[in-house]
């Protein structure tokens, strides 16, 4: 069995889950029109669990900082390459850290994805877990630096380390996407799938693989949590 088999068996479920996240589309639309909807951003971040352990006052401050800086951070980029992504990631995480000093890895990646939904990879610890195993059995992933646990962010100097970690992480997710692009194109046609962002479909499939509480299908067997 291989990752290709896993993708075949779980593609429809992954896409269904992604289509069900309606606020993603609202966030993308808000940004495309340069609008500022603090209630939407707050609700979206809460739904993704990005406010855990943060006071109501700090939540509002983070939303305000995001809305006041996102268009400055993301404007005037002709090519969304790694240098550009790392620069935007560092800028946004720095803005958030200045408001509430904690690791904003997941929030930064997810919010940047809303601006560049076909170019930016979101970070998730379950995906990291899946990649950690896949790297040892997948030759093209072994070409990348060994993925490690995301670094702690205890001061401003650690933000650069976190950005470097994220770039290596997203490089591997994109490598998996590139390796399976033909398969994903075929599955999209066969299932008449309308969810548009393959990069998030791959993320969801890896999330299913790395999440011990998520059921999946393989070789006509449904594997459920004990």
What are these regions (language model features)?
Residues 1-100, 117-226:
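An N-terminal alpha-helical hairpin/helix-loop-helix interaction module that forms a charged
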Residues 107-113:
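Short hydrophobic alpha-helical segments that form membrane-spanning helices or hydrophobic packing faces
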